[in-house]
Amino acid sequence: MVVGRRGVLGAGLGLGCFAAAGSGGAAALAQGVAGGAPRRLSIQRVQTGETFDDVYWKDGRYDREALRRLDWVFRDPSLDEATPMDPRLFDVLHTMARLLDATGAFQVVSGYRAPETNAARARASRRVSRVSLHMSGMAADVRLPGRDSTAMARLAAEMQVGGVGLYRRDGFVHLDCGPARRW
């Protein structure tokens, strides 16, 4: 399903979920994603097989225990090191799942990366930034089985999220909470 600009605006995301701090982008997304309705995510970590399939937002706020469990699934599996992930990233995934009518779990290829892990990846590939937002818990590389990664990247760009990177060859989309940019 390809969603046009009107569909994204209709979902309450016209402001862009990662607008400048002064504009209340996070609050706008929190209100626009689903109003007061509970927000659910279905996630599978590729490297570990671990899953999260639960509500992470209810009664008008984030569920701290659910966020803690999500942080663990998004951890750096090579070091078993976790960090608090930016919950706006979860809101983006939740919204994308709704707009794509997804029934399966997002597969997380990469979430948080410890600085050592990121440095090793950057040495091995020019495609890895030495100052990656993965190290701040503000980025994830994901795919959604049965959904085209190009369509996912296009939707994320229409949602005006921060960074959106399409890695066609690897079949995933990079999403982050940084400045708006596309590659």
Language model features: what each stretch is:
Residues 46, 73, 92-103, 124-127, ...:
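Structured segments of extracytoplasmic/periplasmic soluble domains
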Residues 116-132:
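Charged, often glycine-rich, active-site loop that binds/positions anionic groups
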Residues 20-54:
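C-terminal segment of N-terminal export signals and the immediately downstream linker at the start
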Residues 1-19, 23:
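N-terminal secretory signal peptides and thylakoid transit peptides that target proteins
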Residues 59-109:
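Active-site acidic/histidine clusters and adjacent loop/turn architecture
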Residues 39-44, 127-183:
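Catalytic cores and adjacent binding grooves of peptidoglycan-active enzymes
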Residues 45-47, 56-58, 110-112, 144-146, ...:
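A mature extracytoplasmic/lumenal domain signature
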Residues 105-119:
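Acidic helix-start/capping segments at beta-turn-to-alpha-helix junctions
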